[in-house]
């Protein structure tokens, strides 16, 4: 089980054993990922076999609802096998004989049903309860059982907007949100929807869906990890005018434009054609400098306070980068206690 996690651990061991040949320090490796990759990074924090294989971690927009317990994982596996045409007695045989195209088609169908057939987790992700991943990663962080390395975690201001145009996997419409909340306590439903003024107006639904998919994970990870290790939280608000005009804004994955210096490319020049190039490059330089500094020292800048439960400082990347304290507190607290597994 959890074969992708085993692959990641093997890759990190290779890095440890070989990074010196490239001038690197095996004792100072930083891992970082975005979206499902950020979730993988957070999960590795709770993998005992990854002990000592990395010194810092960065989670950009970690996805929520991907971790399954054994019972939920079994339900998802049964559905997957059924889509492949397996019966009660030949699941393993059917799986081994399936063509790659059949596996992809079955997985696509399973993912498409995720919003209507919530089983306690989305259909892709790790399963806890074995020697590789003994417990839910956030639970391990809360208990102090995860790796106590410095962590950066954060989200983007308009996470959900991407999923109204592409990859329509998130609950960003009223019917999808009501299905999501249908198994929750009625008070929880009222509390969550009230945190998004104007619900069920479209913009409120999109903000709610984005928080469910990414905000909840970032908040939970930050709160759990900061009790035992240095934790820094950010929100990425910057978007050039072209992205605002398109209706996407600072949506999911747009921070990668800054991380990977895309604004210096032809594509980046097109995105910043509306007199935004200087601000885009400024934001990029700032973010990259902080990521580099963190990767070297575990500290992303003296002006970025460590996250605490009492003050909850968040560094906001924008035309004017600044620190805000517990932004969107009403949205954060509205989701407390809610999870797919508890529905």
Model-based region annotation:
Residues 216-343:
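Mobile gating loops/cap/lid regions near enzyme active sites that modulate substrate access
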Residues 22-34:
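Alpha/beta-hydrolase fold nucleophile elbow
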Residues 38-50:
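Short glycine-enriched nucleophile-adjacent loop
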Residues 183-217, 222-226, 232-238:
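Alpha/beta-hydrolase fold catalytic core
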Residues 146-193, 240, 278-282, 286-288, ...:
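C-terminal, loop-rich substrate-recognition/catalytic regions characterized by aromatic stacking residues
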Residues 17, 51, 56, 60-179, ...:
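Substrate-access "cap/lid" subdomains that shape
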Residues 1-20, 78-79:
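Alpha/beta-hydrolase active-site loop
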Residues 1-2, 63-68, 128, 137-138, ...:
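Active-site rim elements
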């Amino acid at each position: 089980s959890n074969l992708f996690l085993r692959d990641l651990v093997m890759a990190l061991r290779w890095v440890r054993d070989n990074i010196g040949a490239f001038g690197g320090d095996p004792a100072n490796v930083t891992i970082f990922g975005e979206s499902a990759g950020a979730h993988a990074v957070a999960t590795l924090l709770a993998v005992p076999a990854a002990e000592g294989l990395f010194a810092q971690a960065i989670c950009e927009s970690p996805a929520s609802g991907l971790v399954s317990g054994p019972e939920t994982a079994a339900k998802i596996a049964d559905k997957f096998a059924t889509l492949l045409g397996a019966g009660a007695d030949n699941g393993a045989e059917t799986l081994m004989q399936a063509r790659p195209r059949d596996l992809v088609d079955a997985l696509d169908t399973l993912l498409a049903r995720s919003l209507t057939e919530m089983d306690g987790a989305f259909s892709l992700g790790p399963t806890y309860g074995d020697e590789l991943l003994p417990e839910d990663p956030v639970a391990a962080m809360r208990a102090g059982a995860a790796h106590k390395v410095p962590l950066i975690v954060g989200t983007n201001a308009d996470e959900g907007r991407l999923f109204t145009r592409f990859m329509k996997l998130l609950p960003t419409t009223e019917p999808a949100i009501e299905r999501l909340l249908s198994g929750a306590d009625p008070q929880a439903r009222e509390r969550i929807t009230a945190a998004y003024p104007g619900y069920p107006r479209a913009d409120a639904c999109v903000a709610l869906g984005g928080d469910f998919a990414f905000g909840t994970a970032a908040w939970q990870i930050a709160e759990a990890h900061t009790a035992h290790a240095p934790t820094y939280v950010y929100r990425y608000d910057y978007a050039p005018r072209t992205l605002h005009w398109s209706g996407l804004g600072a949506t999911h994955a747009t921070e990668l434009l800054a991380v990977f210096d895309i604004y210096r490319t032809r594509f980046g020049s097109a995105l910043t054609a509306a007199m935004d190039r200087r601000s885009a490059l400024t934001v990029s330089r700032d973010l990259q400098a902080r990521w580099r500094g963190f990767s070297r020292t575990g500290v992303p800048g003296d002006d970025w306070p460590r996250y605490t439960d009492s003050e909850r400082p968040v560094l906001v990347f924008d035309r004017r980068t600044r620190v805000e304290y517990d932004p969107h507190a009403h949205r954060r607290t509205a989701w407390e206690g809610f999870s797919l597994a508890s529905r």
